[in-house]
A protein has these predicted regions:
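Primarily recognizes the serine-hydrolase "nucleophile elbow" in alpha/beta-hydrolase
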Residues: 170-181, 186-227
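A fold-wide structural signal in alpha/beta-hydrolase
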Residues: 116, 145-149
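A glycine/proline-hinged amphipathic helix-loop "lid/cap" segment
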Residues: 1-103, 107
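Rossmann-like NAD(H)/NADP(H) cofactor-binding core
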Residues: 106, 149-151, 219
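Catalytic nucleophile-loop/oxyanion-hole region of alpha/beta-hydrolase
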Residues: 129-130, 136, 149-187
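Short beta-strand element of the alpha/beta-hydrolase
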Residues: 114-123
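Short beta-strand-to-loop junctions in surface cap/lid or active-site-entrance loops
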Residues: 105-115
């Protein structure tokens, strides 16, 4: 399991024009299959997994209590995590969505950013929000020098596919057009965890196939997820 320091170091490396890991280098260093054996899991990781299982097992499934109730419960701290802590540094602005709706972007930026990280939150495409991990986004901005832009994409089941991917694509396209003017830097990175990682990959594919601009994103931060 990667620690936050490793993740931040990786983002910082991609944000540095001289620190990009090329595709050729990546191909010569494939993942060691031994990393995926059961005995490769450390005792610390096993202990953490056991704690998570105990915390999550008593919780009702969202489809039983309803998505809206599950989201509200998460915000009250009824679950494995405490109530979210909001950053006083966060700035929210909205961009127009494809269906005439507003897409909020939650921005936490350091002084003189050297790049922009498009963050897509997780939550199984149903839960979570752009404002529910401000402390992590603050650390990301401060440790990497990146402006962090977290997109508040529409959630299922109220907004079924492709609503969420559409909103993420529009956020990425907005950064392609406006990052340099808004943040003084046009080096773009993208990432997220769980469903956020899935949406990050889907967004990159759309940027490549529909906008011919995949090379504008110089790095990805895919913590875990279905991709």
């Amino acid at each position: 399991m990667l620690g936050m320091s490793s993740v931040l170091a990786g983002l910082a490396r991609f944000a540095d024009p001289g620190g990009i890991v090329t595709g050729e280098l990546a191909m010569t260093n494939p993942l060691d299959p031994a990393l995926f054996r059961a005995d490769a899991v450390t005792e610390d990781t096993r202990a953490l997994n056991e704690i998570l299982v105990k915390l999550l097992t008593p919780l009702p499934d969202w489809w039983v209590v309803g998505a809206a109730n599950a989201r509200e419960g998460r915000r009250r701290g009824n679950g494995p995590f405490p109530p979210p802590v909001m950053s006083t540094r966060a700035v929210v602005r909205s961009i127009p969505g494809r269906e005439g709706h507003a897409i909020p972007l939650r921005i936490i930026a350091p002084e003189n950013p050297r790049g922009v990280y498009l963050h897509i939150h997780g939550g199984g495409w149903v839960l979570g929000g752009a404002d529910m991990q401000d402390p992590m986004l603050e650390r990301t901005a401060d440790k990497t020098g990146l402006a962090v832009v977290s997109v508040e994409y529409r959630l299922a089941p109220e907004h079924p596919w492709p609503a969420g991917p559409d909103d993420c694509e529009i956020a990425a396209h907005w950064l392609l057009d406006h990052a340099a003017d808004e943040f003084g830097a046009d080096r773009l990175l993208i990432g997220g965890a769980s469903a956020g990682a899935n949406l990050a990959v889907a967004t990159l594919l759309r940027v490549r196939d529909k906008h011919d601009a995949a090379d504008r994103f110089v790095g990805t931060n895919l913590l875990y997820g279905p991709y």
